[in-house]
Amino acid sequence: KLANANIDELGQQALASNDNNQLNQDNLKSMVSREQKSSYQSLKVKKLEANSLVSTAEAKYLNLWQRQIESSGDRIILEDGILLEGQRVQIIATIDSLGNLIRSEIAFSSGVREIDLLAIKILNESAPFPAFDPLMIEEYGFIEIVRDWNFSSG
């Protein structure tokens, strides 16, 4: 019984040690996540919409971004062979100053799951985007682009 008690006791100690390690890892992940959110929130984000008044640097950036999205989108739509008849979806893309896609989401759904997933796929596969112009970097660290996409087969 004493040997079994020691084994059980060691087993419980090992289990407790593993639990403590897991808690420490969870706490560390939580702290890192909070720091990332805090870092993201502390930087300025410029929101660009379809009818935003934009500076020349922003207008050029949006033009480059749109051309890159359209090139990738045309290729992906051909590959996927999805029927696109007058589908509309509104997307939000958050991009950092290096051109990395930080977040992609659907603001307004098309109502067709395949189309919404296609829009997200196009965003993700189009990244990375061009880095910001130095003038843009002086003003903000991220841009949030809100766009309506109208899908059609033709």
Residue map of PLM features:
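Conserved "boundary/linchpin" sites in short secondary-structure elements
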Residues: L15-E49, R67-G73, D96-F108, I120-G154
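Short, small/polar residue-rich loop motifs at catalytic or cofactor-binding pockets
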Residues: L84-V89
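Short amphipathic alpha-helical segments with a strong bias for extreme N-terminal helices
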Residues: K1-S17
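A short, highly charged nucleic-acid-interacting micro-segment common to nuclease
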Residues: L48-A59
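Surface-exposed patches in mature extracellular/periplasmic domains of secreted proteins
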Residues: I77-I82, P134-L135
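A short acidic/small-residue loop/turn micro-motif
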Residues: F108-E114
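Extracytoplasmic/secreted envelope proteins and their assembly/folding machinery
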Residues: N4, L62-Q66, E70, D116, ...
